[in-house]
Amino acid sequence: MEFAHLTVLSLFCLAFVGITATSSEEDYWQSIWPNTPLPKTFSDLLIPSGKTNSLPIKSEELKQYSTLFFEHDLHPRKNFILGNTNSVGSIIRPFTKSRQGVTDSIWLANKEKQSFEDFCYSPTAIAEHKHCVSSLKSMIDQVISHFGSTKIKAISSNFAPYQDQYVVEDVKKVGDNAVMCHRLNFEKVVFNCHQVRETTAYVVSLVASDGTKTKALTVCHHDTRGMNPELLYEALEVTPGTVPVCHFIGNKAAAWVPNHTADNLCVM
């Protein structure tokens, strides 16, 4: 299926009041889901902000994306320390793809070459479909078109600030083949939305070392043939295409999956 359409975000079917989105974005949301106020999770993603570094993912989120682990590690009482890989380029794009003779991991390390066009129009990985959008309306339209329904679940993370050590409290499977939309670290609002086939999304309830309870959107890749072999060996001592590999998703992102149990949007 062409990736020109996406899906919508949540975990427990709760209504959250949005406070920062423009009226046009909020009105459009209400026209699609009149019984669900715009979640604060989404309104926060729409806040314009100046770049704090030259990378397309904010530096404070890199440890979340760079924590790689096995699917069988997702169980209560499992301990995680965020950040088990060191390559910035590989953290942002764990799938290797040649680009004019230079791999993405090397290219992304060259901070002066970061741009919307470079990141959004770089080659796709194996089994990946991606598309960049610059508004919530475009994201909603694409997600609904992709899934063919407004019955969708939207999920996001809420990692605690300044906390790197967590223990798993609970794990819930959300769905397969989710559409992921990442807010990129550009001055204007830009989302990089993509779907990688043969993936499973989970919501993992975590407790930080200071007792703060959080939840982490987690994606497990069952087809890892296109993953960076150096990254996988550094983190897990495995090779691409052998075992499922999982990673956390940072706070500035959302996953969309079909909702088969309710008649409206479910936000988790």
Curated annotation (Swiss-Prot):
According to the UniProt record, which cysteines are disulfide-bonded? none
Q: Report the glycosylation sites.
A: 259
Q: Does the keyword Kinase apply?
A: no
Residue ranges constituting the BURP domain according to the UniProt record: 68-259
Q: Where is this region: 2 X approximate repeats?
A: 166-222
Tissue specificity statement from the Swiss-Prot or TrEMBL entry: Seed.
Keyword annotations of the record:
Glycoprotein, Repeat, Signal
InterPro entries from the UniProt entry:
BURP, BURP_dom
Query: What span is annotated as the signal peptide, if there is one?
Result: 1-22
Positions of sequence repeats: 50-55, 83-88, 101-106, 166-183, 202-222
Region feature 3 X 6 AA approximate repeats, mapped onto this chain: 50-106
Give the PANTHER family listed for this entry. Answer: ABUNDANT PROTEIN, PUTATIVE-RELATED, BURP DOMAIN PROTEIN USPL1-LIKE
Task: Specify the protein name.
Answer: Embryonic abundant protein USP92
Organism placement in taxonomy: Eukaryota, Viridiplantae, Streptophyta, Embryophyta, Tracheophyta
